[in-house]
A protein has these predicted regions:
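Autoinhibitory propeptides
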Residues: 1-31, 35-38, 49-61
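Structural recognition of the beta-strand scaffold that forms the well-ordered cores
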Residues: 38-42, 52, 108-112, 138-139, ...
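Extracellular/periplasmic catalytic domains that process cell-envelope and extracellular macromolecules
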Residues: 31-35, 100-104, 167-170, 198-200
Length: 239
């Protein structure tokens, strides 16, 4: 047989061009960066320590946009502990005895909850459900800047220039709703509860990259109820 061996080349992931391919450069030039919006990602959770979701870098980006305008950030109506506290009793998770402080991971991730395990561990560390949630969250809203530390000093540098990755809406906040965990998933009762909570929390869009062999009519009812709020609901259907 002929020698069919091939050299394995090193892969260099590069998402730097993906946003411009869908026209986001035009949106950015007109001021649409996602600032003041909330994206709910119902998935496997998130890497809370990842540089793309750094709270300091998120705050820095908003300060750059403000450009000295003291009212700019206030006008964004960012989700914070006080706003979560105000609606906590309306959330499905209220019965589990959590507080807004428990759910708050910072300005970039102001709400994060594990619906399947009924706790606030939304990382990928304690189950085998993959890091898919971080991937999805990054595509949607990975920060415009990433932290760079030199000794005791932290500065923020362009994410596109340094790590070749930036989300479509880099200045949006993320609502992390983990529906895959150590107890399995995703169960209808969990992601439907997450959809309802996302609406209460003021999500501007809801993403579910989920799939099943036969989706029952009840989930479509939940989606339609969400869409009439109106909140766009996006689901990736996988075979």
């Amino acid at each position: 047989y002929p020698d069919r061996s091939a050299e394995k080349l090193a892969t260099q992931p590069n998402m730097a061009t993906s946003s411009s391919m869908i026209g986001t450069n035009v949106a950015y030039e007109t001021g649409y960066t996602g600032a003041g919006t909330r994206i709910a990602v119902i998935d496997t959770g998130i890497d809370t320590d990842h540089q793309s979701f750094d709270n300091g870098a998120f705050d820095y980006a908003l300060q750059q946009e403000a450009n000295g305008n003291e009212n700019y950030i206030k006008s964004l109506d960012l989700l914070d502990q006080s706003k979560v506290t105000a609606v906590l009793s309306q959330l499905n998770i209220a019965q589990n005895g959590v507080s807004a402080d428990d759910l708050y991971y910072g300005s970039k991730l102001p709400f994060a909850y594990n619906y399947v395990d009924k706790n606030t561990d939304v990382t990928h560390d304690n189950d085998t459900q993959s890091e898919h949630g971080s991937h999805v969250a990054g595509i949607a809203a990975a920060n415009k800047y990433v932290p760079q530390t030199d000794g005791d000093e932290t500065t923020y540098v362009s994410a596109l220039d340094t790590v070749k990755t930036q989300g479509v809406a880099p200045e949006a906040q993320l609502l992390v709703m983990k529906v895959f965990g150590s107890n399995g998933g995703a169960f209808d009762s969990d992601y439907m509860a997450a959809i309802e909570d996302a609406i209460v929390l003021g999500a501007d869009s809801i993403n579910l990259s989920l799939g099943s062999s036969y989706p029952g009519p009840s989930k479509y009812t939940a989606y339609m109820d969400a869409d009439t709020d109106p909140v766009p609901v996006y689901q990736a259907i996988l075979d």
